[in-house]
């Protein structure tokens, strides 16, 4: 455990009853509660949002908040405060979420609606330049010729934060499994900063606060480089991070060596969690103190996985970087 922060008591209260959903600790970590919407809640939500196709949510951004309110109302208005409490709690900051009855690629639009409702109870999802929408769907196949590790199946996608090549702060990341065929492996990998045994060493290094250049490959549809330090602090002085090894561009030998050592220290951490995410489930994490990645897949000629992501900002609290807004 890192000396800079201490884990508080787990916020998951197994004795508390919620309306419309259940909440239990996940099998992987007490930092990662698992929230499940009941079958009745799921069915009633889908019935009440059926009049709006996904295209309506794309064109009319206020509808994203409307579907969020519908879901929260179905949960007796207990959902929104629970989501915010968990995501902003440094001891947790993450959820594994699913809805009973949503578990097939034929329900892809319903998955987008559900994830959109949840995300817009805590904030707003940013424009995703890769897709041109507030969310992005992408497919991983057995053979890939893209310009980043996002879709490459036979190697580990290293741990990183999202939103590293854009100017907006990315407070949260939502990652949903839409489809999976002929898949073995490929678990989500997560690392909480306070479980990273080398955090003190790198957070206190002179290069930790030096602005560095981040540049995205062409597939991201972002042409402007951004500059910021890898580490910063939140409002309480605790370490937060904004880093991805693929896109950071060291300007000299000193930065290059330090970044290489940083990457090795992250990837070899004993605090990494391996989390299976079945079709229909999604992870929702605080992007400022959780890093995420993906384990490798076992090769198969018909391998296919489709994912959906949303990433955005919290609208109900300011937990941004303090020295490099």
UniProtKB/Swiss-Prot annotation:
Listed pathway(s): Amino-acid degradation
Molecular function in Gene Ontology: ferrous iron binding; glutarate dioxygenase activity; oxidoreductase activity, acting on paired donors, with incorporation or reduction of molecular oxygen, with 2-oxoglutarate as one donor, and the other dehydrogenated
This protein's UniProt keywords: Dioxygenase, Iron, Metal-binding, Oxidoreductase
Subunit structure comment from the entry: Homotetramer.
Protein name, entry field: Glutarate 2-hydroxylase
Cofactors (names): Fe(2+)
Catalytic activity: glutarate + 2-oxoglutarate + O2 = (S)-2-hydroxyglutarate + succinate + CO2
Gene3D superfamilies associated with the record: Clavaminate synthase-like
Function according to Swiss-Prot or TrEMBL: Acts as an alpha-ketoglutarate-dependent dioxygenase catalyzing hydroxylation of glutarate (GA) to L-2-hydroxyglutarate (L2HG). Functions in a L-lysine degradation pathway that proceeds via cadaverine, glutarate and L-2-hydroxyglutarate.
Keyword Membrane: no
The EC number(s) this enzyme carries: 1.14.11.64
Organism of derivation: Escherichia coli O127:H6 (strain E2348/69 / EPEC)
Any one of the GO BP annotations: L-lysine catabolic process
Binding site for Fe cation: 160, 162, 292
InterPro entries: GlaH, TauD-like_sf
Cofactor binding note from Swiss-Prot or TrEMBL: Binds 1 Fe(2+) ion per subunit.
Family: Belongs to the glutarate hydroxylase family.
Lineage, uppermost ranks: Bacteria, Pseudomonadati, Pseudomonadota, Gammaproteobacteria, Enterobacterales
Enzyme type, top EC level: oxidoreductase
């Amino acid at each position: 455990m890192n000396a800079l922060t201490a884990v508080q008591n787990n916020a998951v209260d197994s004795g508390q009853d919620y309306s419309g959903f259940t909440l239990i600790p996940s099998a992987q970590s007490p930092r990662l509660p698992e929230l499940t919407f009941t079958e009745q809640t799921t069915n009633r939500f889908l019935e009440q949002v059926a009049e709006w196709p996904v295209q309506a949510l794309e064109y009319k951004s206020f509808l994203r908040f409307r579907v969020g309110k519908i879901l929260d109302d179905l949960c007796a208005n207990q959902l929104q405060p629970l989501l915010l409490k968990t995501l902003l709690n440094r001891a947790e900051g993450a959820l594994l979420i699913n809805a009973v009855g949503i578990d097939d690629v034929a329900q892809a639009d319903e998955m987008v609606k559900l994830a959109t409702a949840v995300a817009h109870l805590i904030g707003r999802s940013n424009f995703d330049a890769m897709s041109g929408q507030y969310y992005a769907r992408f497919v991983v196949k057995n053979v890939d010729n893209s310009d980043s590790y996002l879709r490459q199946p036979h190697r580990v996608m290293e741990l990183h934060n999202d939103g590293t090549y854009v100017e907006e702060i990315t407070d949260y990341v939502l990652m949903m499994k839409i489809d999976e065929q002929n898949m073995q492996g490929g678990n989500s990998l997560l690392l909480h900063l306070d479980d990273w045994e080398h955090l003190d060493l790198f957070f206190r290094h002179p290069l930790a606060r030096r602005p560095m250049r981040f540049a995205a490959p062409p597939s991201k549809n972002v042409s402007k480089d951004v500059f910021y330090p890898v580490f910063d602090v939140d409002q309480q002085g605790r370490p937060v991070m904004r880093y991805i090894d693929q896109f950071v561009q060291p300007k000299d030998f000193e930065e290059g060596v330090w970044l290489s050592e940083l990457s090795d220290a992250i990837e070899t951490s004993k605090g990494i969690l391996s989390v299976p995410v079945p079709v229909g489930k999604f992870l929702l994490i605080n992007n400022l103190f959780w890093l995420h990645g993906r384990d490798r897949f076992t090769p198969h000629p018909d391998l296919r996985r489709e994912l959906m992501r949303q990433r955005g900002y919290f609208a109900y609290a300011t937990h941004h970087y303090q020295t490099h807004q």
